[in-house]
UniProtKB/Swiss-Prot annotation:
Residues 28-38, 92-100, 153-430, 476-491, 537-549 are cytoplasmic. This is Auxin efflux carrier component 6. GO terms for biological process: auxin export across the plasma membrane; auxin polar transport; auxin-activated signaling pathway; basipetal auxin transport; negative regulation of ethylene-activated signaling pathway; negative regulation of lateral root development; root hair elongation. Belongs to the auxin efflux carrier (TC 2.A.69.1) family. Keywords: Auxin signaling pathway, Endoplasmic reticulum, Membrane, Phosphoprotein, Transmembrane, Transmembrane helix, Transport. The chain crosses the membrane at residues 7-27, 39-59, 71-91, 101-121, 132-152, 431-451, 455-475, 492-512, 516-536, 550-570.
């Protein structure tokens, strides 16, 4: 039975964290103390210094030679059970699919262990649980977040291949080469493809950034260069309603990617021409960055910092976009202002006003809303450019969609995943902490005091600043439940009921009993991890649902975890 003293101990551990979160919320929502630019600086400090150093501090002090193998096995089995069940559901049921597999796996198995788990479990079940939580943090950072990133890149690669090579053409791809400046396929930067076909019909595909081969002299010739800041800071706080700039599609095997951002611009990225923006008439050039991604997660895998690279289009006197001349192409393409038209319920195209296909005008705002919905539904919709003579043959007539061989896809995904992990500070902090702990506890080498105190002074700020950053993020959201009540309820049930049930089953299966079993169950009922939300936002996969679980879940998780604590103590 839980005593009042034990309950008070738990509240003493949790109240300071929530105090920091609500202070940040009030300072932005009501007092207007911090501007978004100032919030960006706070997030930058937390994401680059405070929390990576906090991770290093915990991991380096954990003895890897005394790891609780049964506890780790239970956690691993629970995640494997969930992944296998979701995979079977995605394969054998029409309602399933890779998109929901990724989202539901994130919700059910990846809680906020570092910031919430360590202080909460330590207050509930004692100091030994800190070691257990640190072990789970290591596994999350090194294994599970890498797996999640792999799945997201797989989805992005499939969308790109389907857009560029509909039907059976993709089956002929023998090699995919990714330029060094392409960090990810998430669409944050406009991409273009170049293809070569040998005498045997095998295709060699090259993925490039849209401006990687365009000289500065060509870029500077544009009449309407839009000034945008560099993305190297990459720490802005954003709302879930921030315009999405990561939706892209191609128009067949011609090497053209069409990239849609949330600034009412359409990015045309051609194999011969650099990508440029089409600005919505009447609104002028947008000051938003194409490559910018703002992360509210101060202690998660941060999106890959990239320098800004832009290639804008020329605009003549009447607002008609003009394709810039490319040294590779040696010619100039011009396109009149496009009209958006629906081809079917889930497929729409950009056609020339002189095209022969019947047209139904819709606003650019509607088109940009419809495009991500079609992608989320299955990734089968595409936008085509009629003026360039694209093939409008329905996908069903082309044949069943094929993909390159597993080896080709594996090489592609491993390449981009490795590049992305290499630019994440938490990757280095986790690995360095693990390496130091292996050395330190093997030969009893203490960390020098000057290094230890330097790390401690920064890591001590990690927990409070991480919660402060979450409060800033919550304050900037227009809605607490942006995904709607139905999806929010489903997500909460999966997070706070299904997750602990799978963890309890796996723990009992491996023989966990007593306080370790209770700690495993309560750990699975922690609020939603932030890293899955960052990935969901970056790859545009159900970000509203993950945002709801981050915001509302932080509030709901405290009474839920205490309820589990009380019930398990009966």
């Amino acid at each position: 039975m839980i005593t009042g003293n034990e309950f008070y101990t738990v509240m003493c551990a949790m109240a300071p964290l929530y105090f920091a979160m609500f202070v940040a919320y009030g300072s932005v929502k009501w007092c207007k103390i911090f501007t978004p630019a100032q919030c960006s600086g706070i997030n930058r400090f937390v994401s680059v210094f405070a929390v990576p150093v906090l991770s290093f501090h915990f991991i380096s002090q954990n003895n890897p030679y005394k790891m609780d193998t049964m506890f780790i096995l239970a956690d691993t089995l629970s995640k494997i059970f969930v992944f296998v069940l979701l995979s079977l559901w995605a394969v054998f049921f029409k309602a399933g699919g890779l998109d929901w597999l990724i989202t539901l796996f994130s919700i059910a198995t990846l809680p906020n262990t570092l910031v919430m788990g360590i202080p909460l479990l330590q207050a509930m079940y004692g100091d030994y649980t800190q070691t257990l939580m640190v072990q789970l943090v290591v596994l999350q950072c090194i294994i599970w977040y890498t797996l999640l990133l792999f799945l997201f890149e797989l989805r992005a690669a499939r969308l790109l291949i389907r857009a560029e090579f509909p039907g059976q053409a993709a089956g002929s791809i023998a090699k995919i080469q990714v330029d060094d400046d392409v960090i990810s396929l998430d669409g944050m930067d406009p991409l273009r493809t170049e293809t070569e076909t040998d005498v045997n019909g095998r295709i060699r595909l090259r993925i490039r950034r849209s401006v990687s081969s365009v000289p500065d002299s060509v870029m500077s010739s544009s009449l309407c260069l839009t000034p945008r800041a560099s993305n190297l800071s990459n720490a802005e706080i954003f709302s879930v309603n921030t315009p999405n700039n990561r939706f892209f599609h191609g128009g067949g095997g011609s090497g053209t990617l069409q990239f849609y951002n949330g600034s009412n611009e359409i990015m045309f990225c051609n194999g011969d021409l650099g990508g440029f923006g089409f600005t919505r008439p009447g609104l002028g050039a947008s000051p938003r960055r194409l490559s910018g991604y703002a992360s509210s997660d101060a202690y998660s895998l941060q999106p890959t910092p990239r320098a800004s690279n832009f290639n804008e289009l020329d605009v003549n006197g009447n607002g008609t976009p003009v394709w810039m001349k490319s040294p590779a192409a040696g010619r100039i393409y011009r396109q009149s202002s496009p009209k958006m038209m629906w081809e079917s319920g889930q497929r729409h195209a950009a056609k020339d006003i002189n095209g022969s296909v019947p047209e139904k005008e819709i606003s650019f705002r509607d088109a940009l809303k419809a495009a991500p919905q079609a992608t989320a539904a299955g990734g089968g919709a595409s936008m085509e450019e009629g003026a360039a003579g694209k093939d409008t043959t329905p996908v069903a007539a082309i044949g069943k969609q094929e993909m390159p061989s597993a080896i080709v896809m594996m090489r592609l995904i491993l390449t981009v995943v490795g590049r992305k992990l290499s630019r994440n500070p938490n990757t280095y902090s986790s690995l360095l902490g693990l390496v130091w702990s292996l050395i330190s506890f093997k030969w009893n080498i203490p960390m020098p005091n000057i290094v230890d105190f330097s790390i401690k002074i920064i890591s001590d700020a990690g927990l409070g600043m991480a919660m402060f950053s979450l409060g800033l993020f919550m304050a900037l959201q227009p809605k607490m439940i942006p995904c709607g009540a139905k999806k929010a309820t489903m997500g909460m049930l999966i997070r706070f009921i299904s997750g602990p049930l799978f963890m309890a089953g796996a723990s009992l299966l491996v023989g966990l009993r007593g306080s370790r079993l209770h700690a495993a169950i309560v750990q699975a009922a922690l609020p939603q991890g932030i890293v899955p939300f960052v990935f969901a936002r970056e790859y545009n996969l159900h970000p509203d649902l993950l945002s709801t679980l981050v915001i509302f879940g932080m509030i709901v998780s405290l009474p839920v975890t205490i309820l589990y604590y009380v019930l398990l103590g009966l």
